[in-house]
């Protein structure tokens, strides 16, 4: 019996909406990354993007445990000497709450062109409203 390999043109993708309100950041991000990769499906194939689309709402209400809200740091670099910038979780969640979830999920995806395609299927919104109602996303309980 030959090993089954999913073909990109036969992959059936679904849309899911996840409410991040009150969820722990890491536990939420691992479940989202698993579904973006398609590892929850029986037809998962490592070299084919078999994942679903994920819409995350209420990103501003995601939480972290312990003292991470003041201790967890996010770094960025301008590319110029001395151009490193750092911001903690508290300030980033106030400034750009979408980036917190996007950064956590992106770090859990492959670092190659296939991983970038998977990352494009993630849509994160700070509030409860999102523009993807036409896709009729199903609610995903995490």
Swiss-Prot record:
One of its GO terms (molecular function) is structural constituent of ribosome. GO terms for cellular component: cytosolic large ribosomal subunit. Gene3D superfamilies: Ribosomal protein L13 (3.90.1180.10). One of its GO terms (biological process) is negative regulation of translation. Signal peptide: none annotated. Pfam families: Ribosomal_L13 (PF00572). Keywords: Ribonucleoprotein, Ribosomal protein. NCBIfam families: rplM_bact. This protein is one of the early assembly proteins of the 50S ribosomal subunit, although it is not seen to bind rRNA by itself. It is important during the early stages of 50S assembly. Part of the 50S ribosomal subunit. Belongs to the universal ribosomal protein uL13 family. This is Large ribosomal subunit protein uL13. It comes from Pseudomonas putida (strain ATCC 47054 / DSM 6125 / CFBP 8728 / NCIMB 11950 / KT2440).
